[in-house]
Swiss-Prot record:
A motif (Nucleolar localization signal (NLS1)) lies at residues 173-181. It comes from Danio rerio. Phosphorylated by ck1/csnk1a1. Essential for Spemann-Mangold organizer formation and subsequent anterior head development in the embryo. Inhibits canonical Wnt signaling pathway by antagonizing nuclear import of beta-catenin (ctnnb1) during embryogenesis. Interacts (via NLS1 and NLS2) with dvl2; the interaction is negatively regulated by Wnt stimulation. Interacts with csnk1a1. Interacts with ctnnb1; the interaction is positively regulated by Wnt stimulation. One of its GO terms (cellular component) is nuclear envelope. This is Protein CUSTOS.
Amino acid sequence: MSESSSEDENTARLKEAVWSFKPEDVKINGKENNGRQSHRADVSKHEHDGNELGTTPEFRSHVAKKLGTYLDGCISEVCSDTVEPAQSENREDEEGFRLFSSSTPGKWMEQSPPPPPKRRPVPSSSDSDSEMEMRFREAAVSLSDILGPVAQNLSEKTEEKSTKEETEDTVTKMKKKKKRKTSSEESQDKVNHQTEKQSNVEGNQEQTTAGERLKKKKKKKKKKRKKLEKDIKKDE
């Protein structure tokens, strides 16, 4: 069988090789033979074997297999149970034909098209808000449901961070308040010190003025005494 199939393939290839060449006009004694037309069949046109497209037998067998599988998939049997055919007067209806060797005899029907999908009714304006709210509530999912223990750990960490930040904020605020108090106290001390200095300076100035006045009075008294002594000496 293998030798015969290989020989058939070789002959088919040789035929295809012969058919691929077109007949050329033959020159006889330097002249073209265009006077008479030959009545021979043109092998390259494949009119004698029905192969106008020039396809290979392998390609034709492949296409036949594909068509057979496609038609077998399209054709469906309504009654899958094997029923014995009842004798009837009209035998012409019972006698049918088979498309392929694999097809089974029986009545065939085209499948009815599937019914169109039902469309949802358009909600009214009054009930649309409540229905949408209910749907949103049903569809709402929390992070704890999705993540589970990871979400709990994250929430605990965030809470710890928030508490730490709050404590740090309170500590910084207390420090700022203390600094403000100390700065205000220092400013008050400076003011008091300056006022004390001013008061001391004023007291010193007053003391100096009083001392100068006393000195001036003493000088005046001395001068008066000296004059009196001079006058007394003159009178003597």
